[in-house]
Design a protein with these regions (language model features):
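Beta1-alpha1 glycine-rich phosphate/pyrophosphate-binding loop at the start
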Residues: 1-70
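FAD-binding core/adjacent interface of flavoenzyme oxidoreductases
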Residues: 4, 61, 65-145
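Short linear functional motifs in flexible/disordered or boundary regions
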Residues: 27, 40, 112-113, 146
Length: 146
């Protein structure tokens, strides 16, 4: 059996734990844009400098190795080939699966008001990269609106 989970948020990680508890032998691959696992609920703690990037993680450092999980990090899914049971990544790589779980969660919504979406200083807060961009921008900002 080949399992593929898209997303390494709380739902994806919990699914991986559950699969590994029931099936210790099968192939398990996780795919995400993220380069490290982090709690989205704790991103505000990063912005307030109460936690660093490592302290946002909710899994042990060796989680993927210990659970024999292949993690394709910093990867975006381009297309699902359902009939062929393959996930195509942006770089053209295809990952085969028998069972697929899409656990990507939501995305921030920036309303289509004027040029708001194109502004370099307007952010959503869903990913660590969002928090990092906000933190960097805040260093130079004179006024901040939340």
């Amino acid at each position: 059996m080949k399992y593929v989970i898209i997303g390494v948020g709380a739902a994806g990680i919990m699914a991986a734990k559950t699969i590994r508890k029931a099936d210790k032998e099968s192939s398990l691959t996780m795919i995400s844009l993220d380069t490290q696992v982090h709690s989205r609920c704790m991103l505000h703690r990063y912005l307030s400098h109460e936690r660093n990037e490592k302290q946002l993680s909710f899994i042990p450092e060796n989680f993927f190795e210990e659970n024999q999980i292949i993690w394709n990090k910093a990867q975006s899914v381009k297309q699902l080939h359902v009939k062929e049971k393959q996930v195509e990544l942006l770089d053209g790589t295809r990952v085969e699966y028998d069972k697929l779980l899409i656990a990507t969660g939501a995305n921030s919504f920036i309303p289509p008001v004027g040029n708001l979406r194109e502004a370099k200083n307007v952010f959503g807060l869903r990913h660590l990269s969002d928090a990092q961009a906000i933190d960097q921008s805040a260093k130079e900002a004179e006024n901040i609106v939340i």
